[in-house]
Amino acid sequence: MDAVEFLKRIEKIDRIIENKIAELEHFRDLTQKVTASYGGDRVQASMSQQKMADAVGRCVDIEREIADAVETLQHDRREIMDVIEQLDARQYDLLFKIYVERLPLIDAAAACGMEYRTAIRTKNAAIDNVQRIIDKNVT
């Protein structure tokens, strides 16, 4: 696996979780808007109840998907942390800020007390080292 792709897994899973949460909020809003009609046509009331049941069922499914994604995120985060913790302190700190905290490189450089050019070199060296670690663990 490519080192950058390996490190970006956290961001992808974070985004999946964020999107699932937004979807869950949408269906929760829907369940609050769908109400049974108490007067008039009985068919209309049962249709509303069915819509409510479908929306509630979808909420339960999405909550389960979120729980699964969080579990995957925790596993991947631990795996990535185990790899980058093997780097020297500067490389570790920079990659943590870029891939875990999702800071832009310029902000990560400032947070690490590095000039931008130094951060670029440090990041490239760190990614090379991550690739070596990944390759070593695969074989």
Feature roles, as predicted:
Residues G113-D135:
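DNA-recognition helix of helix-turn-helix
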